[in-house]
Every structure is written in structure tokens, then in C-alpha cells.
Amino acid sequence: MKRALPAIETAMTAALVAWIGGMFALGAFSARILFRDLPRETAAPAMSTIFRSFDGVVVACVVVVALATGLRLMAVGLRHRPDRIALVAGTALTILGCLDVGYVHPAIARMQAEGGTLEPAFQALHTLSSRSFNLEAICAILIVGAYAWSRRET
């Protein structure tokens, strides 16, 4: 199983790039440009549609992250600190991704469809979504860092 480690870590890294990089691009560029150039009542549903369509990418990446986390655990165990960091960060990332696509994003879309974007509950969900992304990015950095750190110990 240890011989598969480069493939496992490459799959994980590719999933992290697609997921975290994609979410960063959508939030930093798409949302900023849409809300700058379009009326709010047009930009908000457009961004909601974009994020909903990107949820398919997130689901695929969550599956890869979960599998890679489990396979890496079987391959190397938990003997070294980087291995424990990678396990905890991969597990946290999987949970955060499931929370996003299973609850946060659908709740935001539902409130948007009902015209509740000015409600405090919508703002709370939007804040939760932003904080979840920040935690996802931190988890991704921890995973990549743990992979690099584990190379030093072998």
C-alpha cells in the first residue's frame, strides 16, 4: 500500500486545487465582478446558480479527499506528526464539504428563491459559508504542508 502513496497524495492535491482554487476564483472574482456590474437582484441569483453548479465539483472532491485520507492512513499509519495532521485536516475538510453541499448552499439557495436575502438568517448563512471556506483553505494548507513535512522524515 505504501507504494501507492504518491498516487494517493497526487489525487488529494488535485482535488484540493480544484475545490479550494475553484471556490477562491468564484468568490474573489466572479462574485465581485457580478455584484459590481449587475443589479443586486440579478447578481445574487446568478451567483447562487454558479455556486450550485460548482457543488458537483465539491462533491467529487469531497469523495476524493475522503478516500485519499483513508487510503493514506492505511498506507502510513499515524506514527509521525505529519500523518496525524493530514488525517485530522482531511477529515475536517470532508466534514466541511458535506456541511456546505448538504446544508449551507441549499439553505442559501432556498432563502434566495424565497426572497429572504435581506433577512438576518441569510446573513448568518452567508457568514457561515465564508467561514467554512476559510477553514477549508486552512485544512488544504495543512494537508499539503503535512505531505511536504512527511517527506523530510522519511
Set out the residue ranges of the language-model regions:
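Mid-bilayer segments of alpha-helical transmembrane spans in multi-pass integral membrane proteins
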Residues: T91-P106
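Membrane-water interface at the C-terminal end of transmembrane alpha helices
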Residues: C139-S150
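Phosphate-binding/catalytic loops
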Residues: P106-G116, S132-L135
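Hydrophobic alpha-helical transmembrane segments
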Residues: D55-V62, H126-I141
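Alpha-helical transmembrane segments and their helix-start/interface "positive-inside/aromatic belt" motifs
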Residues: R3-L16, R81-G90, A146
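Short, charged juxtamembrane terminal tails flanking transmembrane helices
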Residues: K2-R3, W149-T154
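Interfacial loop at the N-terminal end of multi-pass membrane proteins
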Residues: K2-V76, M111-Q123
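Cytoplasmic juxtamembrane regions at transmembrane-helix boundaries
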Residues: L73-T91, R152-T154
